[in-house]
Amino acid sequence: MKFSDIMKKAREKNLGRKGIKRRIKNIRKTEYGKYWQDVEKGTDGQWYAKDGTSFFYNGTVADMHPLTHEDFLNFIKSKDDIKTVLEVGCGDGFYPIKFKNLFENKEYLGLDIGEPAINFCKENSNFNFICDDFIKMESSKKYDLIFSHAVIDHVYDIDSFLSRIVTSCKKYAYISAYRGYFPDLEDHKMHYDNSRGTYRSNLSAKKIKEVLVTNELSQDEFSIKGQKDGILLDQPYSEGLTGISTIIKIERKSNSKK
């Protein structure tokens, strides 16, 4: 039941303040991640056409944030010692499907919380994919490269998500946060979108640094920068955005020793 409906019924029944509070507490919180489970069903826009072609999610980074996409390609192509790769929040497989050459002779694993997206990946790619919650999943495996685009903005525990990337990364990590660059925020500013069951967060650069240092990365092993991402600010999908993304890069000096 919507908040407005609860208030209307409360007024009709002349409930007092305590009665209204009890009604508000009964508003059901949408389960986290519901949006990524429902999109295939068409409840909030289709991901997949009838022929299996993705036209909603696929290419989000390249099409909406082309400068971030270009920067990521330069990052991964500059490394010649990557054998294992984990993509956290692979969606419907833009990189392993459209840019599969990036992972030739590499062990790639795509992970996403959305089962429809993972099913699509398995049907359209020969790489490995699993549906799981990265923060909670039971795995001790480490990867040479971990990358994640526009996912950390939506997770329910930003610090745990980032910490898990650091502890699972043997050499390199590339993380993009598209909602802006916030160097003055003391802590992350999180907003829960109950209609979708997901968060929309502004990440504190100060807090990111604190988490990285706490996880025993030295100052010369990471960078946190605000970079132009190339999004078209005159489009409806860019409402509330600045055209600047937060880019976190990790390059361990001692690699697998940590």
Name these PLM-found stretches.
Residues 145-156:
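A short SAM/SAH-binding and catalytic strip from SAM-dependent methyltransferases
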Residues 198-216:
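Short alpha-helix
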Residues 160-173:
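A short glycine-rich, Lys/Arg-flanked "PGG" loop and its adjoining helix->strand segment in the class I
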Residues 1-137, 149, 246, 255-257:
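Conserved N-terminal segment of class I S-adenosyl-L-methionine
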Residues 138-145:
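A short acidic, Gly/Pro-enriched loop at the edge of an enzyme's catalytic core
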Residues 174-202:
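Conserved class I S-adenosyl-L-methionine
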Residues 218-230:
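Conserved S-adenosyl-L-methionine
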Residues 228-258:
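Core SAM-dependent methyltransferase catalytic element
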